[in-house]
Amino acid sequence: MVKKGAGEFKNRVDRVVKRDGRVVKFEQEKITKAVLKAFAETGEGKEAEAKKVSSKVVQLLNKNFKKGNVPEIEEIQDLVERVLMILDFEETAKAYILYREQHRKIRESEEALKEAVDLVDKYIQEIDWQVKENANMAYSLQGLNNYISSIVSSKYWLNRVYSKAIRDAHDEGDFHIHDLDKIAVYCCGWDLQDLLRRGFTGVPGKIACKPPKHLRTAIGQMVNFFYTLQGEVAGAEAFSNFDTLLAPFVRYDGLSFKEVKQCMQEFVFNVNVPTRVGFQTPFTNITLDIVPPKNMIEEAVIVGGVPQKEKYGEFQEEMNMINRAFAEVMAEGDASGRVFTFPIPTYNITRDFDWNDENLKPVWEMTAKYGIPYFANFINSDMDPDDARSMCCRLRIDNRELHKRGGGLFGANPLTGSIGVVTINLARIGYLSKNQAKGQKGRATGRAERKDFFARLDKIMDLAKESLETKRKIIDSFMKKGLYPYARFYLDNIYKRRGNYWANHFSTIGVIGMNEALKNFMGETTATEKGVKFAEEVLVYMRNKLIKYQEETGNLYNLEATPGEGTSYRLAIKDRKKYPDMIFANGQVGENEKIEPYYTNSTQLPVNHTEDFFEALDLQESLQTKYTGGTVLHGFMGERIQDAETTKKLVKTISEKYALPYFTLSPTFSICPSHGYLIGEHQLCPKCVVEQKCEVYSRIVGYIRPVEQWNKGKATEYGDRKEFVVG
């Protein structure tokens, strides 16, 4: 508390960070002059009072900032507002707040034109790290167009939609609001059966297709659906029951296996064409049932938009053909041996899964070679194949919660997803929270320090909730105005039942940097017993808070293990600038610009902790199962598993022994322009007589891309990774 009668205070803060990032000399006189201008408008004080205010600000600066930590301009101005209120200069405080806001708008207006020109240069010259923020986006004219439009959309959200508190929390790095570059929802799961029933149609003035009668037509409409709806969704799209719903078309068309494989080849090649804005491939996911789900066995099949006499349970042979053909196409790769990044297939592993099914051999080969699929564990996890659907690389949907809340959803109608995602910077909370154990490995963290940690978490989570509620209202209003015409058509049944198009879509809060939070807070990690125990406590606390949010708002919330492709780097950069002594995933990098800082994804292990996959599984199981929104454990491997049979046994062991909901096996591989696929990492082709550069591929977060396209933070993480060894 600042005492009103306090006199001059000796200043130990000698530097300040300006808005452009430059560090300059701190001058108390500038604070005095700014306050004096505000006094001139209100008449509440003169130079003596202005000096008094600036002295109190200096006093608070020295209290709040340790030696070596440098305050930012905005933080100093926040303190000026606070001191004016404490000293009862209320009118001046209001004038000062108005002054700040007016000058912010003036600065933005002046910067707008310069920014527009600079943006082109930044992209062309690849100056901005965000040029490579998304590894799915290649350097191109379309990438340039997307880069420019993304900045405009971000400014719209931050300056026209969100409150100042939310804007500041994002800009300063307390949390990260995802997909600010798009005025759209995060991800959507669509109802493939509805598409087969109605066809690709529904928007006035646009081409309308009748319900498909043939497999090739159905697949063509699926591709067009993905392409078109990707323009109305910021992130991933998904279809569930891919093999179950398409199997009847195989019989009705009288197709041979060769013809089915040709159809699958057309589908896979078409969905990997970079047609999305920014020269991206649409981010697509499909779920394969392998056997008909119990809730669909007696359901009439849809062909030509009409229910037929046969039931889905009668088409196991055709499902086998689709699954084998799809897996063979994915395992073969493209003409150069490159991996098909999309669609990401999710395979449901159930208790009655037939591990000896010969038709699934290509699945194990695809997994061993490229590591493409996700495996959904329905054996030991809390999920059920009839009511849980994989939505994208990270979003795990539990429809049972929706059912309890009147959503009326079931396995064949997965019209759900996520409105938006906000990721909490746990690393910063750990650093800022007072604790006795910092730097003293093994010491117990006291009550006061724990209280401070959870108080900070509370505050940031409440702001995240506010931002998500705001986004939901904005997106809903835009939906009603027709900004998302196809989504409005295919979500019409939800609107009829619930009175809101997005009623089944979650508001998602994620976490990043738990490992670094533990390092900074209590000298532990996600690989130590005490660290795991505290991490579990934090996740349970967050889950309970999300339940309260659901009760308060009537909207669905979930907790996600954020992928953090760009977030892990963006937040680390901000924290290094503000707190040079902070510990990152790669240690105390300080102000050394040659080392790129990054945070460990969600509550994952340090990337260099172990080569033992089963040790990692043991350490992660209790944390992975705490998420309600989505999580996956990636088994990063230095090279492919040579034997597909070993791959199958490994997947079987993990599914039967662990309760992890989702996992992958992710080998590193290379592509030579002449020799195609190469096992492991090769910067240069070992087979070429003339030296040729190779593309090195690995899974960046949820999907597989060339390492060369990764941002600097993720590229540093890749270099630090200790890959698992599988015998």
Regions found by a protein language model. Name each.
Residues V2-L119, Y123, K722:
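Charged, amphipathic alpha-helical regulatory modules used
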Residues Q102-I106, A112-A503, E524, T528-I679, ...:
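Conserved catalytic cores of very large enzyme subunits
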Residues N515-E524:
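Well-ordered alpha-helical scaffold segments within catalytic/enzyme domains
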Residues F39, V260, M264, N520, ...:
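Metallocofactor- and cofactor-centric catalytic cores in central/energy metabolism, strongly enriched
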Residues L457, G510-G513:
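A conserved active-site cap/scaffold subdomain adjacent to cofactor or substrate pockets
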Residues S670-P673, V690-G727:
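Long, charge-rich boundary regions
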Residues E90-H103, Y658-Y662, S666-T668, K712-G727:
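Long, highly charged low-complexity segments enriched in Glu/Asp and Lys/Arg with interspersed Ser/Thr
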